[in-house]
Amino acid sequence: MTASATSTEGQEAASTSGFWGLTLGSIGVVFGDIGTSPLYAFREAAHGAAHGEPVSRMIVLGVLSLILWSLFIVVTAKYVLLLLRADNNGEGGTLSLMALGQRALGRRSMFLMSLGVIGASMFIGDSMITPAISVLSAVEGLKLAAPALEHYVVPLTVFILVVLFAVQSKGTARVATAFGPVMVLWFASLAVMGIVHITDDPSVLAAINPYYAVQFLLSHGTIGLVTLGAVFLAVTGGEALYADLGHFGRKPIQSAWLFFVLPSLLINYFGQGALVLSDPAAIENSFYRMVPELLLLPLVVLATAATVIASQAVITGAYSLVSQAVQLGLLPRFEVRYTSESHAGQIYLPRVNRLLLIGVMLLVLLFRTSSNLASAYGIAVSTTMVADGIMGFVVIWKLWNLRAAVAAAIIVPFVIVDLSFFSANLLKLFEGAWVPLLFGAAMAVTIWTWRRGSAILVLKTRKIEVPLDDLIGSLEKRPPHIVKGTAVFLTSDPTSVPTALLHNLKHNKVLHEHNVILTIETAQTPRVDVSERVRMEKISEKFSKVRLRFGFMESPNVPRALAVARKLGWQFDIMSTSFFVSRRSLKPSSQSGMPSWQDHLFIALSRSANDATDYFQIPTGRVVEVGTQVTI
């Protein structure tokens, strides 16, 4: 055997092991939410269909058929086979899809921006419900194992969730390696439990025929629509497949879903159906009734571990989404802490963590059971799925270069299905669906206020700013005292004089040897190639313009990026460089163009924003802050 042949075989083996490693990782992270749905989805759907009456055979077959075809259409066809191909430089998710759509159109679209904001806001609302309903439904198994422990279900759930949120600041890199094996054990258990009961009554497999789904909806009227809202619980988490695209890649996610996760879920749902056909009373908790009493406690422990992993994935997703929103200018700069030196994506946002914890605690204490929480679950996810579908149309039409009619033929059937689920979930508005809508609306108002206030602030400051070329010309005619070193002035408008530069000249009456007007931009792509990171333009002997570009999923590190400028001829030395940053103190104005409440909200958001020094990772010892007062 030649050396080249040996090398090729080694590369193929490494590639294969890498693929299976990513597949295992995706099982542990991507499918946690949808993978824990069997705990409550079939039970809630059958309960809703029976409407207080005994569960009949036609109800069981109808519900199973609806679940099966919902998983086929919404998750498999729409997300796994279609939208996973709509990646933004390898990344997925609502905001990535929004940015991809903007890029496809070649301009900023307020419609796409609104869809992206709505989808992202509803994801945050869903991020509060998923941990609450998942962990609560798992711990409820204790009521069957030991009825005397029923009063401890809520306190134990609260304890588990508090611990989960408390350890976020420590990072999850160490324990994340166990997520894959635990979830593999979970899905394997789902399949085994289902097989045992399906063999008792194989006739339940008749529900594979879509006739039972259609017949159920046609014959049950409004109750059928209510049931559809409960059936949707089986597909919640499907949007996470797309959001985690950048972490694992399309093929590992597709393989894990098609060959392991989907079969395990379907087998378990059909097993629950077979159990209820033989024992209608089992519908009270059809999942835990699938195992003998001896295995009940181990199953509760495994289910709790699976729901904690599912919750962790959702929490991490919320951090990532908010971080992207900050980079895209949709939210103020939140404090971001990096919990792993080797994984840049391992981040922790203290404020987001606190808000999620408060929301989750309120949900658990107010609703107290997973059945009650099920009424609140679904509306946020269905809203996000509708938004994804519409934005997906733009990408298929403009980026994939298909005719509008062809793109519509592909995506409209999915949007119709999504709208059907959205309508069904709206029926639960007063039973609890208002909760995620309230959370999502609060998030959307926050984003809208920040965008609107920031735009007004830019317009007001531009009116009083001095053109940079005019100042340079004036300084050349009457030069001030020159001091050694480099001054870097951060600004959003490179054509105007940064406020910090004006204040430095006014109060200190000095100018540095080298002055850099630094602008930081966020691209519509997740990451920016190093070769495109820095653009430098020398505009006079003492002044240069530098533009730094970062992707919306990157952590902006200004000193590291400026080091790249050495290749462009700038001998950057951090120890001889001072960074001048403006800190604005905002005051409300009756002429701002916004309502008074929005003025005050924008000012509060601005005050809560993290320091530019920390956010851009500039050494504090090299920073000079200049305060200015602005009336908006």
From Swiss-Prot:
Membrane protein topology class: Multi-pass membrane protein
InterPro entries reported in the protein's UniProt record: K+_transporter, K_trans_C, K_trans_N, Kup
Protein name: Probable potassium transport system protein Kup 2
Keyword Protein biosynthesis belongs to the record: no
Coiled-coil region(s): none
Transmembrane region(s): 19-39, 58-78, 110-130, 147-167, 178-198, 216-236, 257-277, 290-310, 347-367, 377-397, 404-424, 429-449
Record-level GO cellular component terms: plasma membrane
Chain's role: Transport of potassium into the cell. Likely operates as a K(+):H(+) symporter.
Location(s), subcellular: Cell inner membrane
HAMAP family: Kup (MF_01522)
Record keywords: Cell inner membrane, Cell membrane, Ion transport, Membrane, Potassium, Potassium transport, Symport, Transmembrane, Transmembrane helix, Transport
GO molecular function, one term: symporter activity
Origin: domain of life: Bacteria
Family per similarity comment: Belongs to the HAK/KUP transporter (TC 2.A.72) family.
Catalytic activity: K(+)(in) + H(+)(in) = K(+)(out) + H(+)(out)
